[in-house]
Regions:
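Nucleotide 5′-phosphate-binding alpha/beta core
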Residues: 1-109, 115-148, 155, 197-199, ...
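General small-molecule cofactor/ligand-binding pocket signal
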Residues: 175-178, 250-252, 404-409
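Conserved AMP-binding/adenylate-forming
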Residues: 233-314
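AMP-binding/adenylate-forming catalytic core of the ANL superfamily
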Residues: 198, 301-399
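Short, hinge-like loop/turn segments at secondary-structure boundaries
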Residues: 167-168, 216-218, 267-271
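Short, structured coil segments at secondary-structure junctions
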Residues: 170, 222, 244-248
């Protein structure tokens, strides 16, 4: 009861809109496809009109191609609007933001998976809707957000930030893995015994399951869901998690800019969050429109992932009529291999985020691993001696002596395949 009280108190103070949205999602999950698409059209028309009136970026873009908000009469008219690229978002961040006095906004930042991090303001209504969508997905598995849970996500090694993280985790009945070293890992596995769900980066969940199986550690028996997000879930991941947890990894697909795009139901189908987003598939690539966020409009956003949509005729035995994503093919999560230990690739995000946050040093980067225990950091500009020293300090903070590395500035950062990746590994295990 304590954790429920703390959760509801914090939720209602931070996100006053969320209760109403949870009730709405409970009702709308029973809607027909036709009713869902009628709602989507209404929200799209509102979004386009609002963006045209309050965002200089969208007004200029629409005027340049002679498109007026009144031209959007059906969902098919979405293709009249220009595509928004990641480059557009990073270059025109200020102009995309709307000039409107929202009562409450939150600062949001992307993970910088392409080597560049975006920071923008998300209005309270959109933030609440996104959180409501996650809670609603958990309800399909009889999970409450305040249930004890293991978290495979980010953390920061600075003393103050680590204390803050531990405190917030305690209040949210949450614990997280801070490393794969024996003592820390064993303590984490002990806590898993009483957890109701675990969630986070799929590659970290896989690594944990693999170690539990290899070390023949006690297997959790109370878990109701293992949820992976932000990375592609390979079948070999599920082979290990079924052995370790008795469950496959359930997929939650989304992005900071778009909000939750899809959530996998207990029948194994990834239903699109049609109340929150519009999804298009163009040449197997996803374009997403965030229907709920007005503070920083995201319309026809080229997310950079490759997907396969199911036929509109496909019906799920769970009874929901929301359209289905058959597969997300573009998100691949890799581990970093030291001489002795294995690390999550999100360490790179924190290394460069810390440089920006603490020293105002912004670097466009790509990290290459061809051999275990060795990393190549490629930077696309000249870096000063003091910047290099600070970068070395951050790298050592996360990897210590377990990794040898070189830093090459003025590098040409290349894409691997069609999608630019901030970490490329030649090691596959």
């Amino acid at each position: 009861m304590f954790y429920k009280f703390i959760y509801l108190l914090g939720r209602n103070l931070r996100n006053p809109s969320i209760k109403k949205q949870l009730l709405f999602l409970k009702d709308s999950e029973k809607w027909s496809l036709e009713k869902l698409e009628k709602y989507q059209l209404q929200k799209l028309q509102e979004l386009v009109s609002f963006s045209y009136s309050h965002s200089s970026y969208y007004k200029n873009k629409f005027d340049a191609i002679n498109v007026n908000p009144s031209d959007i009469k059906g969902l098919k008219d979405l293709n009249k609007l220009p595509i928004l690229t990641k480059s557009d978002v990073l270059t025109h961040t200020n102009n995309i933001h709307v000039n409107y006095p929202f009562k409450k906004t939150f600062k949001a930042a992307t993970s910088g998976s392409t080597g560049n991090s975006l920071t923008f303001h998300r209005d309270e209504y959109a933030d609440s809707f996104n959180r409501a969508t996650v809670s609603h997905g958990y309800s399909w598995y009889n999970i409450n957000p305040w249930d004890k849970n293991g978290y495979f996500w980010g953390f920061n090694f600075s003393f103050v930030e680590k204390l803050k993280t531990i405190l917030l985790d305690k209040l949210q009945h949450r614990f997280r893995i801070f490393g794969y070293q024996d003592k820390e890992f064993t303590n984490f596995v002990k806590k898993l015994q009483s957890a109701k769900y675990i969630h986070g980066y799929s590659s970290m969940i896989y690594q944990t399951a693999k170690l539990i199986n290899q070390k023949k550690l006690p297997k959790p028996t109370n878990l109701k869901i293992v949820k992976g997000t932000s990375e592609k879930i390979f079948e070999k991941y599920n082979e290990e998690t079924r052995k370790a947890f008795g469950l496959k990894i359930v997929s939650e697909y989304g992005a900071t800019e778009s909000g939750i795009i899809a959530f996998e139901c207990p029948e194994g189908n990834m239903h699109i969050n049609m109340e929150g987003v519009l999804v298009e598939e163009i040449n197997n690539e996803i374009l997403v429109t965030n229907l709920q966020m007005k503070s920083f409009p995201i319309i026809r956003y080229q997310l950079g992932d490759y997907i396969k949509l199911a036929s509109r005729d496909k019906h799920c035995s769970c009874g929901r009529n929301h359209l289905i994503i058959e597969e997300v093919t573009g998100r691949i999560g890799n581990n970093v291999y030291g001489k002795e230990n294995v690390y999550p690739s999100l360490y790179f995000y924190y290394i460069f985020k810390n440089l920006d946050k603490n020293n105002q040093i912004q670097l466009n980067y790509q990290v290459i691993q061809e051999k275990k225990g060795e990393l190549i950091f490629k930077i696309d500009r000249t870096i000063l001696a003091i910047e290099k020293d600070l970068l070395i300090s951050e790298i050592n903070k996360y990897f210590g002596l377990d990794v040898d590395f070189s830093i090459i500035d003025n590098s040409v950062i290349k894409s691997e395949g069609k999608k630019l990746k901030s970490f490329i590994s030649a090691i596959h295990e």
